[in-house]
């Protein structure tokens, strides 16, 4: 195919107007097996594409690659009725006669490279996937639910939604907490304003580069205190960007790591334990149990599980200690008394040993975390941990870009605080319920 194959007489003006993609023209065709055959508008123009390697205009068509795509056409202004269209796009690949070795595809804007959906269909799929499963949304639109395409579909829409957000208003207190999702750790960056906890973002990994890329967008002069999980790369990043801030490890972090260790023991040694909701009831203070009738069942279950009994007793000691005015010496004593059989707690002992200076710094802080801080962090961690299986981009999109951010206006400029922790937890659980219950997506 080249300029000899089609002329302007081959253009179907009515179908081109009906399709409504500015850069494409529809060709007259008698083929019923391919939907609409389309080429780029520049196919009929004298424009010479520049070589991306040497910027020369001495380029010519080298070959044609046919791309099959699905497109979405809305049939009403309310975007409730639609039609899915098959497109066969004849995409030209150009060769540069100047540098001789460069072969490149003609650039397009209506669809991403490698994606089998046009951007307007891709955007509709992404908007639905923020709230429902990708498979359910694809079923609604009648297109294949390829897992290979979900990342490309979501990343484009995430970039768009992110571009609409106002800049972050830098809080005086920042917290960086690693949340666990499908066995991987992702730093959640939290801000504290007027006693409320807000989520600013969830980062792809805990590396210094990733964490630093976000932190440098904040105003270092405004940050006074940073609560950081005991992870070396996170500490290196915050020390680099906020050298004047007080950087500490909180009692909440110690309790969270101890709780995670306790959960590992419950899952390995507590199979068929005679208590409903054992993960929650075996990780809270004995005196705070919401149902006292489970106390005899806990005692009964522990009789045949000596390692779980040891872990439970030692974890209870830590929880009781944290309710008092504890000291570093108290924590070290608890760590020294970790039973040899319960090596899951050794990681908590390492935190107390290695990050003792940062824990001591927390004790001397004039301003402690708000009363709801531990509850807010645990709620976020639990909600994300229980989200249905998906890739990171989908998880982050559902958490950060499908929930309303709190904003404020100052000197005529709009700023955002982030997402209030209670709203974040509620919406994540709602989205997870949508997916688990396989609720219908659409307008039925």
Label each region the model flagged.
Residues 1-101, 105-107:
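Short, conserved DNA-binding cores of transcription-related domains
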Residues 48, 53, 59-60, 183-185, ...:
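Acidic/histidine-rich catalytic cores and adjacent linkers
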Residues 72-185, 221-223:
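Short, positively charged, Gly/Tyr-enriched micro-motifs
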Residues 176, 252, 372-374:
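Single, functionally critical "micro-switch" positions that shape active/binding sites
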Residues 244-263:
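Inter-helix linker motif
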């Amino acid at each position: 195919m080249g300029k000899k194959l089609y002329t302007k007489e081959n253009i179907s003006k009515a179908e081109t107007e009906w399709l409504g993609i500015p850069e494409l023209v529809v060709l007259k065709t008698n083929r019923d097996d391919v939907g609409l055959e389309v080429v780029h508008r520049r196919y009929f123009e004298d424009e010479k594409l520049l070589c991306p390697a040497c910027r020369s205009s001495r380029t010519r068509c080298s070959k044609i690659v046919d791309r099959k795509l699905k497109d979405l056409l809305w049939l009403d202004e309310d975007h409730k009725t639609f039609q899915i269209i098959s497109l066969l796009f004849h995409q030209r690949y150009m060769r540069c006669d100047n540098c001789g070795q460069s072969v490149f595809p003609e650039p397009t804007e209506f669809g991403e490279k490698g994606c089998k959906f046009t951007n307007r269909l891709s955007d509709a799929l992404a908007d639905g996937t923020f709230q429902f499963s990708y498979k359910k949304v694809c079923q609604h639109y009648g297109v294949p639910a390829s897992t290979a395409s979900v990342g490309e579909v979501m990343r484009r829409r995430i970039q768009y939604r992110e571009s609409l957000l106002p800049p972050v208003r830098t809080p005086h207190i920042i917290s960086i907490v690693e949340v666990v999702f499908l066995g991987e750790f992702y730093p959640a960056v939290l801000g504290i304003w007027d006693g409320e906890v807000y989520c600013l973002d969830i980062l792809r990994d805990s590396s210094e580069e990733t964490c630093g890329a976000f932190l440098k967008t904040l105003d270092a002069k405004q940050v006074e205190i940073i609560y950081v999980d005991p992870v070396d790369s996170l500490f290196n990043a915050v020390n680099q960007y906020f050298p004047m801030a007080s950087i500490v490890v909180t009692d909440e972090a110690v309790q969270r790591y101890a709780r995670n260790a306790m959960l590992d023991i419950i899952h390995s040694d507590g199979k068929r334990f005679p208590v409903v909701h054992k993960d929650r009831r075996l990780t809270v203070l004995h005196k705070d149990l919401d149902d006292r009738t489970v106390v005899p069942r806990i005692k009964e279950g522990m009789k045949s599980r000596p390692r779980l009994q040891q872990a439970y007793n030692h974890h209870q000691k830590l929880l009781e200690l944290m309710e008092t005015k504890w000291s570093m010496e108290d924590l070290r004593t608890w760590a020294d008394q970790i039973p040899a059989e319960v090596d899951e707690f050794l990681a908590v002992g390492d935190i107390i040993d290695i990050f003792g200076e940062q824990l001591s710094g927390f004790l001397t802080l004039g301003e402690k975390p708000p009363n709801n801080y531990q509850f807010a962090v645990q709620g976020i961690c639990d909600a994300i941990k229980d989200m249905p299986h998906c890739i990171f981009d989908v998880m982050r999109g559902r958490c950060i870009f499908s929930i309303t951010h709190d904003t404020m206006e100052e000197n005529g400029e709009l700023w955002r605080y982030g997402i209030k922790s209670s709203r974040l937890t509620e919406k994540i659980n709602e989205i997870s319920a949508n997916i688990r219950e396989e609720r219908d997506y659409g307008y039925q």
